[in-house]
């Protein structure tokens, strides 16, 4: 190993603590979160991403539906572990069965998902799950993992002098960052159940929602196979649903 290569790597690693915004215990999860962005930084990132999402996907042009989903979301947000944040809930004009959050505190639901749900309680369970991602700070943690994965790729390339190693590390980084991961999804499920119950809705609705997703997933896999493409599955390759 080239000893001179160690110096920039050590400098790279030494800079990491300077970027950490906090590792305090999260009241929603009872765990310590190591993240590289403060809540204010996350809000700014989410605002910027919202403009891109609206441009790329478009909002459903039915204000009554938008208002209804926002009102339901606010009910759940008020009983979450972060009730003082400014939440916004949007319906995306997309036929796919999906819902997602980019962080504090925007939640997006596809119109295609809404038409497949059968009750208000099922909609609440979806919104509660996404709010669970926010209160557990999963988006911020995923962003931090992405930064660390990129730094790891740079370090591997410097230490070995091999671009091939860096490329392999990048493949690992992509798999690591994509999706929230099974543990995070289960954590969001647990928080979503808790918030649904606090808001006065039957927690059993989440199980029915899972069944809707599973049926939609089977249909999407069959259609994708016929169309010769990859299926578009809710929450990515590491989904627990």
Model-derived regions, located:
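A Zn2+-metalloprotease active-site environment signal
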Residues: 7-8, 15-16, 23-241
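Bacterial N-terminal signal peptides that target proteins for export
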Residues: 1-10
């Amino acid at each position: 190993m080239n000893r001179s290569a160690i110096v920039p790597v050590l400098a790279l690693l030494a800079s990491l603590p300077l970027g950490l915004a906090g590792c305090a215990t999260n009241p929603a999860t009872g765990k310590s979160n190591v993240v590289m962005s403060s809540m204010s930084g996350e809000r700014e990132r989410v605002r910027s991403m919202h403009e891109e999402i609206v441009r790329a996907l478009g909002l459903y042009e039915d204000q009554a539906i938008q208002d209804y989903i926002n009102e339901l979301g606010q009910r759940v947000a008020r009983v979450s572990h972060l009730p003082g944040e400014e939440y916004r809930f949007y319906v995306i004009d997309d036929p796919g069965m999906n819902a997602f959050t980019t962080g504090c505190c925007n939640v997006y639901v596809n119109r295609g998902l809404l038409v497949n749900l059968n009750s208000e309680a099922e909609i609440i369970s979806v919104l509660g799950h996404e709010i669970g991602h926010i209160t557990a700070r999963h988006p911020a943690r995923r962003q931090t993992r992405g930064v660390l994965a990129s730094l790891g790729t740079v370090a591997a390339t410097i230490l070995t002098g091999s671009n091939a190693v860096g490329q392999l590390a990048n493949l690992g980084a992509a798999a690591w960052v994509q999706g929230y991961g099974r543990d995070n999804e289960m954590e969001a499920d647990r928080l979503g159940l808790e918030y649904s119950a606090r808001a006065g809705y039957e927690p059993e609705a989440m199980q029915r929602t899972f069944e809707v997703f599973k049926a939609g997933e089977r249909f999407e896999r069959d259609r994708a196979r016929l169309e010769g493409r990859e299926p578009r599955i809710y929450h990515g390759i590491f989904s627990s649903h």
